[in-house]
Structure formats: C-alpha cells, structure tokens
C-alpha cells in the first residue's frame, strides 16, 4: 500500500512451477483463499481472482460433456435406389461417449453446387438408434447425419487436480453451473466483503479455442437472420449451397451468430452474475477467432492488456 499497490489478481496456475503442499480446490485451499480475502479487506487492498483454475477460460473437473463446449459433427452415406429403404447410418465421430442427433439431410450426390430447394430434411425419419426409413426418390443421394458432441478442450494452465473440460460459451446455464461449482464455498465471503471493499473476478485472455454449436443454435440463428439454418448445414461440411455468393453470405451470418452468442452469453452473462453480487469484472478481451474484440470488451467493467 505504501508503494502504491492498490490490489492484486490471484491465479491458481499450474504450468512451469512445482506442485505446492496444498492441494488445489481442497478444503485447505479454500480456507487459505478465505484468509487472503480477509487480509485484503484488513489492508484495504482489492482482491481479484480468475474465474477458474489456470488462466483460461472457464472450466474444471465438474464440467460434464453436456455442459462443455459443443461442436457439430456429421457422417455421410451414399444411396442409389428408387424405393423405400431402412438403413443404419454411421454415428458421426464424437467424444466422451456423448452424442446428440440434430439433423438428418438428403442432398443430391455429386453436385458441386447444391440447390437449396433440393435439400430434404429427414430428421423425423431417423430413429433414436440412427436407423433411417425413407422412400428414396430416383437418383443418387448423399445422406448427411448431423449431431453435436463435446469438444476436448480443458481450462488452460491449471494444476492437474483442477483441470477439466471448459464450459459451453454459448450457454448461460453451463456458465452458471461452472460459477456455482467454482465459487460455492467462496462466494458468501466475497459477496459480503464486496459491500464495502473491492472484489473482482476475471476472464483472462481467451485461449480455449472455437466452438460452433449449442442446443438452441438453430433457433437463435433464425431469430437473428430470418431464415432457417438447416439447409446450409452442408456448408459447414465444405459444400456449396445455392451459389458461392449465398454460401459466403451464410458463413458471414453464422460467424456473426457465434460472435454474438459468445459476447452475450459468456462475457455478458458473466458480467450480470458478478454485478448481482457487487463484484467488479475484468477481462483481456482478445485471443479467439470467434470473438469480435470490441463487442466483448464493452460487456465487462475493466479491460486489460498484457506486455
């Protein structure tokens, strides 16, 4: 305080340093953090800490695959018959024995540019075991079975005991779950001290990669842009739908939705949760391809850089 230090930020880091005598996230660790909070209050110092172990981004051993970052996955099957078929479609590649079907589409096979109106939506003909029953029109068709799975992305640079999957950045419910698990033993003291002293939480530079799906992505997309997402799903599998121009326009809209969901549901919701407790928010608003930095920066109280 005499030297002009007004506060500090605490990181539970685990990269490049020896493992200490106190186990990360243990009861002893919690007691030490609570002691640090009280000492900061006594000394008139601002206490801030990262929102999860490590320094990026929001995860831990409590995050299950259904609450982790979600990505789209698909399999392809060619068929050439003009009659009813009952066929087992291959399950798309997935992680952690976690997979949910989203759409089943049929598109004309061997076409460089796929007319939008030729894409058939067959999801209601696909059963829970991945068996498709369909009266196939004459011609050669490519069946695309789309689904979602969890991304194998963990919080960065955390001790091994407190490393786990990173939460879904497009889901406020997943972020709520993470924050509740991380701070359930600390938040009562933090909220109490925040009434008369400075307490902060931080999302450091974003280093846990992209995601491209969440359960309500189709509804959010249609509400934002006024057209359905599913006919353009083949674009995410490197195909051209309608025209090159239409495909590029869809990709712009899709990336816009990702950026909006990321800013609103991750950074914006983090700010909302912290504000409810009287806690100041910090961020380094950069590091990920799916973010618009200025859109992210305006969500939180204080922006930072590093050098």
Language-model features: where?
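N-terminal-proximal low-complexity accessory segments that begin disordered
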Residues: 1-18, 22-23, 294-297, 303-305
């Amino acid at each position: 305080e005499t030297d002009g230090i007004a506060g500090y930020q605490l990181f539970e880091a685990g990269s490049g340093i020896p493992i200490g005598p106190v186990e990360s996230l243990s009861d002893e660790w919690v007691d030490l953090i609570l002691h640090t909070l009280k000492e900061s209050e006594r000394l008139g110092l601002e206490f801030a800490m990262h929102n999860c172990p490590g320094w990026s981004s929001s995860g831990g051993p409590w995050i299950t695959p259904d609450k982790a970052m979600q990505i789209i996955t698909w399999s392809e099957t060619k068929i050439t018959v003009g009659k009813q078929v009952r066929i087992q479609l291959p399950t798309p590649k997935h992680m952690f024995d976690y997979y949910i079907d989203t759409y089943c589409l049929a598109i004309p096979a061997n076409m460089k540019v796929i007319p939008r109106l030729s894409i058939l939506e067959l999801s209601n003909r696909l059963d829970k075991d991945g068996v498709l029953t369909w009266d196939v029109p004459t011609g050669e068709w490519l069946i695309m079975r789309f689904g979602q799975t969890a991304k194998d992305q963990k919080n960065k640079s955390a001790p091994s005991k407190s490393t786990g999957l990173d939460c879904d950045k497009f889901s406020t419910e997943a972020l709520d779950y993470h924050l509740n698990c991380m701070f359930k033993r600390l938040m009562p003291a933090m909220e109490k001290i925040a009434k008369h002293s400075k307490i902060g939480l931080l999302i450091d530079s974003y280093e846990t990669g992209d995601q491209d799906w969440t359960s309500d992505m189709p509804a959010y997309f249609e509400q934002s842009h006024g057209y359905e997402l599913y006919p353009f799903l083949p674009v995410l599998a490197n195909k051209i739908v309608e025209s090159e121009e239409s495909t590029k326009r869809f990709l712009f809209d899709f990336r816009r939705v990702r950026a909006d969901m990321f800013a609103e549901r991750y950074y914006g919701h983090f700010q909302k949760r912290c504000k409810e407790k009287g806690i100041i928010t910090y961020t380094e608003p950069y590091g990920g391809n799916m973010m618009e930095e200025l859109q992210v920066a305006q969500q939180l109280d204080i922006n930072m850089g590093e050098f």
